């Protein structure tokens, strides 16, 4: 496949605690970044889902665990999205995004996580809504 890229193309996928975007959280985030020169970088984070109001780990819906194979116990020692948000934002910077079903679920879920982090006090400069 020949791609004529002028900016990096970032393919991404998430796994979550459930399908309710305002109430569920990302538990795994995977990126494959393809650069205009053809170089590729891959990154995956396992993320402890955090309830910012209750200040505790958010449980994974059992039906979500059946789909993604990730359990609460697997995430106990993982960082929260708050802790990886800066690194995630760096990966997104200056990239065009691509993914399966990304505009209906993955992108809104990612935007929700960034919004929670900003409400918790971390200042980020992430724009997932404006096409470049």
Task: Write out the residue ranges for each language-model feature.
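Conserved non-catalytic scaffold segment of RNase H-like nuclease domains
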Residues: 1-128
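A contiguous binding-surface segment within folded domains or other stable secondary-structure elements
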Residues: 132
């Amino acid at each position: 496949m020949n791609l004529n890229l002028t900016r990096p193309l970032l393919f991404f996928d998430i796994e979550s605690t459930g399908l309710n975007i305002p109430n569920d959280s990302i538990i795994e985030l995977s990126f494959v970044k393809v650069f205009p020169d053809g170089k590729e970088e891959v990154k995956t984070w396992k993320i402890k889902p955090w309830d910012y109001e209750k200040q505790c780990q958010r449980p994974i819906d059992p039906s979500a665990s059946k789909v993604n194979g990730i359990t609460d116990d697997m995430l106990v020692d993982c960082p929260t999205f708050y802790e990886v948000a800066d690194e995630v934002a760096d990966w997104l910077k200056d990239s065009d995004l691509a993914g399966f079903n990304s505009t209906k679920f993955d992108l809104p879920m990612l935007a929700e996580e960034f919004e929670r982090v900003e409400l918790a006090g971390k200042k980020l400069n992430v724009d997932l809504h404006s096409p470049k």
